[in-house]
Amino acid sequence: MNIINKFINRILPKRFDKYWKKIEDSQNIDSTLRYITNSFINSKSYKLTSNYWHVLNISNYKSLSEFGIKKYGSTVAKNYYTFTEIYHDEWFDEVINNLKDSPFKIDSAEAFKKQADFSLKESITYNYLCYLLFYSLKKTNTFQHISKLNDKTYLGFNDPYIKINDTNITTDKIISLLDYEKIQKAFEVKKFKRVLEIGAGSGRTCEAILSIEKHLKYILCDIAPAIYISYSRLKLAFPDKTISLLIDIDNKIELEEKIENSDIAFVFPHQLEMLNENSVDLTLAIDCMHEMDKSTIQYYFKLFSHFTKNFYLSIWEKTDVPYSKNILRKKNKLDYESGDYVIPENWKNIFKEKIVFPSNMLSLGFKIKE
């Protein structure tokens, strides 16, 4: 039966819009999520969505329809950067190397803390990872910024956390600051004015960066429900900033004007086609492009060459994109060193390091020549 189901899924892969019709009127689907989702399904961006994210979105919306956003941190977040299972030893290489000569103490009450809606096994895995990441971050200059991150948002959606040195710690907090550490090593962020992040997810990185670099204007580009989650989060994080949901604008001039008049703006992927040449100082793609088909990656690279001056990318060194098989194609394999990402000739690689965790991921910086 499993073989038959797999074959059927290759011919007729799951599509999120069919599931959405069943849950659209659920009590926990609020008007903002309903608006964003319907706009997404009717947009060109829906056609860019990989089979993998059709499957994940069905899972994400099932959680949202049952619990709403209030339990995001213990449900949907598991499809982003909340690790409750460690599948490969090599994920730990960098973090262990960082800490092998730096002993630290673990509070057993925190290590064995049972997190809401997690099993004990999941909780212990998550809690121990918090310790490893916290003490890795402590060895960097970016550690000084940890107090700038707001518990109202990093802990405000039923997020799992432990307390270390009287500070509430989540993996999202630490990973976001470790992302900033790499970005700052690749580029002088203080010199930039406008940043765009594609695949911005929950908005965790955006919130961390804007909590440190308060002068920046920020564009978040993603699909539903990520835009809904990050929009809800960032309105809570930055109540004094002008935050604009621009997902239905199809006029180039109007879009640029509204982006310019916003501190934080939200767009769908296809709207990137309307951005002016060299209008973005830095584009970020953190933990997202390795989930795409090769043709979609090249679609984005072509757009980046037009509108951005610098590009930061974090990806798995090697991966097979889940659910990418179809009747005509085997696995969609992506291997950076083998050239599967086909970096444009006018991009100069200026930065390359391994991610602290998972350490079989690469962080890469590119200067885009005009």
Where do the PLM segments sit?
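Class I (Rossmann-like) S-adenosyl-L-methionine-dependent methyltransferase catalytic domain
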Residues: 4-36, 40, 155-167, 171, ...
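A short beta-strand submotif of the Rossmann-like class I SAM-dependent methyltransferase core
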Residues: 285-288
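Conserved SAM-binding loop of SAM-dependent methyltransferases across substrates and taxa
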Residues: 202-213
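A short acidic, Gly/Pro-enriched loop at the edge of an enzyme's catalytic core
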Residues: 274-283
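Conserved class I S-adenosyl-L-methionine
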Residues: 191-201
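N-terminal accessory regions of S-adenosyl-L-methionine
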Residues: 2-169, 365
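Conserved alpha-helix/loop element of class I SAM-dependent methyltransferases that forms part
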Residues: 173-192
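A short, conserved alpha-helix within the catalytic core of class I
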Residues: 291-304
